[in-house]
Amino acid sequence: MEPVPLQDFVRALDPASLPRVLRVCSGVYFEGSIYEISGNECCLSTGDLIKVTQVRLQKVVCENPKTSQTMELAPNFQGYFTPLNTPQSYETLEELVSATTQSSKQLPTCFMSTHRIVTEGRVVTEDQLLMLEAVVMHLGIRSARCVLGMEGQQVILHLPLSQKGPFWTWEPSAPRTLLQVLQDPALKDLVLTCPTLPWHSLILRPQYEIQAIMHMRRTIVKIPSTLEVDVEDVTASSRHVHFIKPLLLSEVLAWEGPFPLSMEILEVPEGRPIFLSPWVGSLQKGQRLCVYGLASPPWRVLASSKGRKVPRHFLVSGGYQGKLRRRPREFPTAYDLLGAFQPGRPLRVVATKDCEGEREENPEFTSLAVGDRLEVLGPGQAHGAQGSDVDVLVCQRLSDQAGEDEEEECKEEAESPERVLLPFHFPGSFVEEMSDSRRYSLADLTAQFSLPCEVKVVAKDTSHPTDPLTSFLGLRLEEKITEPFLVVSLDSEPGMCFEIPPRWLDLTVVKAKGQPDLPEGSLPIATVEELTDTFYYRLRKLPACEIQAPPPRPPKNQGLSKQRRHSSEGGVKSSQVLGLQQHARLPKPKAKTLPEFIKDGSSTYSKIPAHRKGHRPAKPQRQDLDDDEHDYEEILEQFQKTI
């Protein structure tokens, strides 16, 4: 087949003959775009092979042959078209008459001229229909007697047979739809007429979208038929050609098999690496991989080392076989205690630094000393100094005495425990009180305890000869991440497998020839991968890793005069806890531990709770208000009356 313009090939194409393989004979390139414009291919090189799978009509451009004006018609245009001429044209009237008399057609016949004709004082415009009735002698010249219809009247014209055209014969035919006209090769580029359009004559120029397959293209290529390129049909000689289709690992992940698969890397995504493992450097173009399928289990744990100035971060597979031992957790604020609290599981902590309570805000916001033992009961609310509710963590103070001589005092404290209210912003420092020496697997640990938690690896994973987790004094297991991974090995090193997350390392690959062998026994998979700092913080931004919102800022301290004015006006509200969640029930105290308040705010006295043995005393307060205090309040009352 000789090369033809792409537009001509598509118009003459029979859809039933698809697919067809084409070779580009003359390439085209649009400057400013490498691959496509508006989703359509615009760059084809000479020699490219195209496998056309579907042709779709996009629109039809309707052109006025007289003025060259254009308009667009939708493929579902409902108008009807009639051809104004036939594919055969005649240069003179004599040729037209000769062809008509020699054929089975008889006179009269209708025709039109593509040029204006001036004769006998009249002008016949182009595309105006004339009816040739007979050939006669007129003024000694052999002429064609024609009838011209004008404004309901018929005018007889005598045109010499030597009159030059070109001329087109016209035959009445049944109106056709837009698709019927486009599917008839005999009507290609003919002048048509349509009563629903404003122009008497028009030419239809369809535009198609070609859907094709090309080498090394992941998706179907869309090519406009108006692309100025010549093509050649090579279907007969190219039936054996296999078009290579690249894949992404994320697409391989969606497959159900069969595995293993042999793949070759075509492209590695740009950007900083996510793992610090040796195999990352081997992921280059041309490297062959063996994909064994979906990794199991699908969850991972994000862990960070402790005990070093610069922490290291790891992604630990759920299949990790090392043994872990719990370590006490550290909590810098009361808000962190709330995040670790779980109903039904006692959480006991020990204060590791002295901290003064904000007794001006609430008398029950007690101070803590090093060694104070607390049991977390749950969240609640308490009255603040300004009458607003303050979010607090309700705790119970535990005894730190264990002698036999003090058993009675311990029993008394057990019957009447001291309640401690810690605002969420309380800047204390706590460490978890625990005595758990069991050795857990990673799966058991995450199932029984909430994250984050502190652990120590006491036995390495035997399937990981260079397990790095055993070298740290402690690990902080931060979050559990559920993400599908693919088990992969290098074709050059099938003995060691690793897991790739297609979501974050989506390689472009292509299926390679051959079927890899499945190794005997279980696959040796690296269950610990060290992360780069950049990727670690990227993981921490995931919805599954979102850290709880920071605690509210502490309330601003009021001035002394403002506090006293507030006290004199309405009195200090009771610091009784307003609300506790159902899971944090408080023990009923035997005696009242809160000071009583008199209606008159001017004579309010706050009593300091009795200091218990082993507890750091709270900041001393004046219990007996002197006369100056009363004088001050009297002056204030007089001042208010004066105002």
Swiss-Prot record:
A Gene Ontology cellular-component term: nucleus
Induction behaviour: By contact to a reconstituted basement membrane.
Tissue: Expressed in different endometrial adenocarcinoma cell lines and various other cell lines apart from the prostate cell line LNCaP and the ovarian cancer cell line BG1.
Pfam family, one: CABIT
Sequence positions bearing Phosphothreonine: 593
Start and end residues of each stretch annotated as Disordered: 546-631
InterPro entries: CABIT_dom (IPR025946), THEMIS (IPR039671)
Positions of the UniProt region annotated as CABIT 2: 239-514
Biased segments, Basic residues type: 609-619
CABIT 1, as annotated region: 1-238
Post-translational modification: Phosphorylation at Tyr-632 is induced by LPS. Phosphorylated by Src kinases (Lck or Fyn) following BCR engagement.
Residues annotated with Phosphotyrosine modification: 632
Record PANTHER family: CABIT DOMAIN-CONTAINING PROTEIN, PROTEIN THEMIS2
Subunit organization: Interacts with VAV1. Interacts with LAT. Interacts constitutively with GRB2, LYN and PLCG2; these interactions increase the activation of PLCG2 and its downstream pathways following B cell receptor stimulation.
Protein name: Protein THEMIS2
Source organism of the structure: Homo sapiens
Lineage: Eukaryota, Metazoa, Chordata, Craniata, Vertebrata
